Amino acid sequence: MSIKISETLTFECETGNYHTFCPISCVAWLYQKIEDSFFLVVGTKTCGYFLQNALGVMIFAEPRYAMAELEEGDISAQLNDYEELKRLCVQIKKDRNPSVIIWIGTCTTEIIKMDLEGMAPKLENEIEIPIVVARANGLDYAFTQGEDTVLAAMAHRCPEQKTEIEKKIDDKSIQELFSFLPLKTKEKSNKSFTLKNTFSLVLFGSLPSTVASQLSLELKRQSIHVSGWLPAQRYTDLPILGDKVYVCGVNPFLSRTATTLMRRRKCKLIGAPFPIGPDGTRAWIEKICSVFNIETQGLEEREQQVWESLKNYLNLVRGKSVFFMGDNLLEISLARFLIRCGMIVYEIGIPYMDKRYQAAELTLLQETCKKMCIPMPRIVEKPDNYNQIQRMRELQPDLAITGMAHANPLEARGINTKWSVEFTFAQIHGFTNAKDVLELVTRPLRRNNNLENLGWTNLIKIQKR
């Protein structure tokens, strides 16, 4: 039986009545990733309460982030902003001595037009610690865009790649230094110099060190060396950028960073699908290999092995339907992976859609739908939650992947839910972590199966009558 499917993806845009976390929540994972950093959030009491409650870190634990709390005197311009921030930064230097201080701007600093970018260079010279300014405020579309803002700001601080003239001068000085060595040794050193003039690869996106190592290892198996990550584990190890550097993203919400790397740092962007799921990871590696003119080795077999290991999960999700309400900008990649697993995706709600940055991912989504003979899902940018609930009532999906604000009301209406924020903090990238994605997706489905086996669902139905 052949299923008639639409050839192209349909995009819609609604009013954007969505609820999400504030982008300053990026501090939660970035302060752990950049080990020698200190994050200073410049905002009001509300920002402080959010960080304190959402991150669950007590003050006495002395985490590597703090609040510079704005008071009435700051807002009415009675206090000197520069002196106040200087006092705090001097104290941070004395207590923690970080390699970099990252100022996180908030809605309030935007509204009162606080010139953080103007103050930072002057204060940086005084305290002799780099200060990076990132305006990760609540005016963004999704909370994950906070990381995008920080990485875009850090891209400006990456060391510059040396020009050909500078390289030749360095090479000449090294050759002169080793001029006493035999001729054969000099020839070998010349060969190594010419090899170093080729293009290098830098990956951008914050991932746990184990996942980053896994992706680097997968590329190493294809004879591709990753010269650096943005962000690096230490600020002092930021990657070298320049016109002979290829960059590739690992997350769909880093469009601002990609633009900065291309326009400001003259890097060349590799437009690849994102390494989420075995299919996405394979496509990501293949695209990078094609840019470096390298034929992939054993990648198809590697992907097949992963699919074989996921059989138990695939039997659970095959034929089930899912509805994405939109929360963290990972929706397109997750939907593509779940379609490949045999699920039907009714709708992909997404807070913001950069079609250029996600072009390769959208193409892979289209190809996956055709391969699986599944209708193309409708993609709704800035979805109206009220309209979404009406559509869900009609469609009755088996699972809704939603923000925390809507989870309980939907559960009360008999729709299984999964918090989208869990996918942000879980390890979902690469071949080996595909299992974790399906573990999260199938948890509510497995719970329902267990309740049915115990007879609880029948009891609930009787009570409702």
Swiss-Prot record:
Superkingdom per UniProt: Eukaryota
Locations listed in the record: Plastid, Chloroplast
Cited Pfam families: Oxidored_nitro
Any one GO CC term of the record: chloroplast
Pathway(s) this gene product operates in, as recorded in its UniProt entry: Porphyrin-containing compound metabolism; chlorophyll biosynthesis (light-independent)
GO biological process, any: light-independent chlorophyll biosynthetic process
Keywords noted in UniProt: 4Fe-4S, ATP-binding, Chlorophyll biosynthesis, Chloroplast, Iron, Iron-sulfur, Metal-binding, Nucleotide-binding, Oxidoreductase, Photosynthesis, Plastid
UniProt KW Ligase keyword: no
Similarity-based family: Belongs to the BchN/ChlN family.
Protein name as it appears in the record: Light-independent protochlorophyllide reductase subunit N
